């Protein structure tokens, strides 16, 4: 019985000591968290710039731009033509009642 009581007492003291040590541990403050965040973002940016310098990525970007331009040019021309036609029809409707 004494052994059981001693074991429970020892367990209670150890758990209280552990909680006390955890409270005394230094918690990271906001300034260090912000500094760590900016350092991580800076490192990521540097890695991204190094990857972007590669000729393979530049070639992919150029090919993507050219493909997009090829697909969008006819659409933009058609939209411009449709807009001109719409505006000319609108202007024709305004001038007809004035001449009658």
From Swiss-Prot:
Secretion signal, residue range per the UniProt entry: 1-18
Biological process (GO), any one: lipoprotein metabolic process
Cross-referenced InterPro entries: ApoA-II, ApoA-II_sf
Modified residues (Pyrrolidone carboxylic acid): 24
Pfam families, per the entry: ApoA-II
Residue ranges of coiled coil: none
GO cellular component: spherical high-density lipoprotein particle
Molecular function terms, GO-annotated: cholesterol transfer activity; high-density lipoprotein particle binding; lipid binding
Alphabetical UniProt keywords: Cleavage on pair of basic residues, HDL, Lipid transport, Oxidation, Phosphoprotein, Pyrrolidone carboxylic acid, Secreted, Signal, Transport
Location in or out of the cell: Secreted
Quaternary structure annotation from Swiss-Prot or TrEMBL: Monomer. Interacts with NAXE and NDRG1.
Family listed: Belongs to the apolipoprotein A2 family.
Biological role: May stabilize HDL (high density lipoprotein) structure by its association with lipids, and affect the HDL metabolism.
Descriptive protein name: Apolipoprotein A-II
Source organism per UniProt: Neomonachus schauinslandi (Hawaiian monk seal)
Gene (UniProt): APOA2
């Amino acid at each position: 019985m004494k052994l059981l009581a001693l074991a429970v007492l020892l367990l209670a003291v150890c758990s209280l000591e552990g909680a006390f040590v955890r409270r005394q541990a230094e918690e990271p403050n906001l300034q260090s968290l912000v500094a760590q965040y900016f350092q991580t973002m800076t490192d990521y940016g540097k890695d991204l710039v190094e990857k972007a310098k590669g000729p393979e990525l530049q070639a992919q970007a150029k090919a993507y731009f050219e493909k997009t331009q090829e697909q969008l040019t006819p659409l933009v021309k058609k939209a411009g033509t449709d807009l001109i036609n719409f505006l000319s029809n609108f202007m024709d409707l305004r001038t007809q009642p004035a001449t009658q």
